[in-house]
Amino acid sequence: MDFYQEYITTIHDFCIDKEQLVKRIEGLKVSRPASLIIPILYKEVENPPLKKIITDLNECTYLSQVVIALAAETTEQYVHVVEYFKDLKLPHIVVWCDGPRIKQIIFDMKKKGIDLTSFKGKGKDVWIATGIATLESYAIAYHDADIVTYSVDLPAKLLYPIVETELNFFFNKGYYARINLDSMTMHGRVFRLFVRPLLDTLQSESNADILRYFLAFRYTLAGEFAMTSDLAMNIRIPADWGLEVGLLAEVYRNATTKKICQIDLGYYDHKHQELGVNRSEGLCKMVSDIFTTFMRVVTESTDNRISESYLHGIHVRYKRLGQDLIRRYHADALCNGLYYNRHEEEIYVDMFARVIRKAGDDYRHDPSDVLMPDWTRALSAVPDLREKLYEACIADVKEYCEKK
């Protein structure tokens, strides 16, 4: 436990009164309504964490709406998810992001000069759900559907700094300890062994303010965050695994750091991914996308040129810092009685280092981005786009789910 303040405001959980947080958000429900967006893959419906999340959300009566951004391939899958979420008693809507109606809307946008047809995945789904949520929300919280350690106060912690009139933050990101107390293991390898040493490496090459900003976040890759609808309308959302990093870069460009904060969410665990044997799968795919996003940040925000020699230096320094961190985490784990496999951690650092070289070379040859357009631009082309998406969701329910 500490009370250190980073470059951005850090809200610690010394003794947060969760009941008071909920009461205050409830009191602001009319003037500052809050929504929650949950991106979900169809296969996650069968995972135990989602059932508990729904049970806990039923106690979050301060939420005006829950928007489920669903990736499903068939009508049967869509109907199954709609039926599954009937246990959620809060006002909610299931957005079938791959459904024929929304696909047609996306295709029609191409005629207006906004081509989203090549985008797919979580980023696109979050973008669609954000448009719908901003119709009636002052603030929007986001979190995934696989949180094992979910609790009723998680959305409240994310939303309170945004809706509280004495604070008025524009953006709030969660941070936590990725520790499983049942198995006594330390997780979060992509952040611990890749993102943090990479940021330290990049900062040593260029003392840019945006890198200082990134280093201030205690868990850069946290998928739990909240923001005002106004900010959500003005940021470009990345469409790949660089979502969390790219989003932070967009927030930096659109909001003063005085209005950005992070909050302690305690212990956290979720479904884990395998390392993968190449850059197209598992954690290696994630690391590749994240590294590419950071290279784009360096290109846009510093004087550094992404050359072969620059990438070689990054590769060497990253690997050294990663190996140094393994020794530190081993000491931390040993003192806390946590299981820690140093050999396995070394394997991860070696693999991540190889990804840096390959992803860096790819970026040099093709530095194009994978950012969705911001909603402000989309509405300038199609003013009623949000309403069209909402109406498509309602029509999907009527056609596929209501008994004839």
UniProtKB/Swiss-Prot annotation:
Annotated (2R)-3-phosphoglycerate binding lies at G188, R189, V190
CC cofactor note: Requires divalent cations for activity in the following order of efficiency: Mn(2+), Co(2+) and Mg(2+) ions.
- Spell out the molecular function terms from Gene Ontology: glycosyltransferase activity; metal ion binding
Q: How does activity depend on pH?
A: Optimum pH is 7.5-8.5.
Q: What class of enzyme is it?
A: transferase
Q: How does activity depend on temperature?
A: Optimum temperature is 50 degrees Celsius.
The UniProt catalytic activity note for this protein reads: an NDP-alpha-D-glucose + (2R)-3-phosphoglycerate = (2R)-2-O-(alpha-D-glucopyranosyl)-3-phospho-glycerate + a ribonucleoside 5'-diphosphate + H(+)
Q: Which residues bind a divalent metal cation?
A: D146, H270
This enzyme's EC code(s): 2.4.1.266
Identify the keywords attached in UniProt to this record, alphabetized.
Cobalt, Glycosyltransferase, Magnesium, Manganese, Metal-binding, Nickel, Transferase
Q: Which cofactor does it need?
A: Mn(2+); Co(2+); Mg(2+)
Superkingdom: Archaea
Q: Which family does it belong to?
A: Belongs to the glycosyltransferase 2 family.
Q: What does this protein do?
A: Involved in the biosynthesis of 6-O-methylglucose lipopolysaccarides (MGLPs). Catalyzes the transfer of a glucose (Glc) moiety from uridine diphosphate (UDP-Glc) to the position 2 of 3-phospho-D-glycerate (3-PGA) to form glucosyl-3-phosphoglycerate (GPG).
What's this protein's name?
Answer: Glucosyl-3-phosphoglycerate synthase
What organism does the UniProt record list as the source?
Methanococcoides burtonii (strain DSM 6242 / NBRC 107633 / OCM 468 / ACE-M)
